[in-house]
Amino acid sequence: MATVLFVKANNRPAEQAVSVKLYEAFLANYKEANPNDTVVELDLYKEELPYVGVDMINGTFKVGKGFDLTEEEAKAVAVADKYLNQFLEADKVVFGFPLWNLTIPAVLHTYIDYLNRAGKTFKYTPEGPVGLIGDKKIALLNARGGVYSEGPAAEVEMAVKYVASMMGFFGATNMETVVIEGHNQFPDKAEEIIAAGLEEAAKVASKF
């Protein structure tokens, strides 16, 4: 039995959002293939996720050094710790997110900021930072209306690149990625593109 954390970063309904369709398809197929696993769903738009600021930065630094925290710092660290510990305790983590304005939704960026903790997800060494979550399985589920996997737009895709880079920085070595793209760029092929992506999601989910 494994504990699997599903992180959803889009609050649009499925009929309006291909990334939500992708997320829901992966979730349903995973549950069907792994009925005994513990599945935890985290909808970031239903959470209170304050931006990282002075209290959280100073608080997490003080925690690492064993210093006393102010009341405000302690509250900020407690918020980050809640999500960090949940992430660390999961055997597998699935991220479902769109590409908006070339990058990820702000709630997902903030959530990943909470995970970025020296001594927890990575450590400093004389040779540079080393990730600490190498045995955790990660799946990235992304949808984008245009084509960003190749051509001139590839350089400006900062959604999958960012999340994959952060998970790599944390030491993840077992990552799966499912992307649906081009359904807005090629509306006459949209149904075919989306159907193929959902089929791929089902295959990956059944083996994840």
Swiss-Prot record:
EC number: 1.6.5.-, 1.7.1.17
Keywords: Flavoprotein, FMN, NAD, Oxidoreductase
Top-level taxonomic group: Bacteria
Cofactor note (record): Binds 1 FMN per subunit.
Pfam family, one: Flavodoxin_2
Cofactors required: FMN
The keyword Plastid is annotated on this UniProt entry: no
A GO molecular function held by the record: oxidoreductase activity, acting on NAD(P)H as acceptor
Assembly, per entry: Homodimer.
NCBIfam families: PRK13556.1
Family: Belongs to the azoreductase type 1 family.
Function: Quinone reductase that provides resistance to thiol-specific stress caused by electrophilic quinones. Also exhibits azoreductase activity. Catalyzes the reductive cleavage of the azo bond in aromatic azo compounds to the corresponding amines.
Name of this protein: FMN-dependent NADH:quinone oxidoreductase 3
Species annotation: Bacillus cereus (strain ATCC 14579 / DSM 31 / CCUG 7414 / JCM 2152 / NBRC 15305 / NCIMB 9373 / NCTC 2599 / NRRL B-3711)
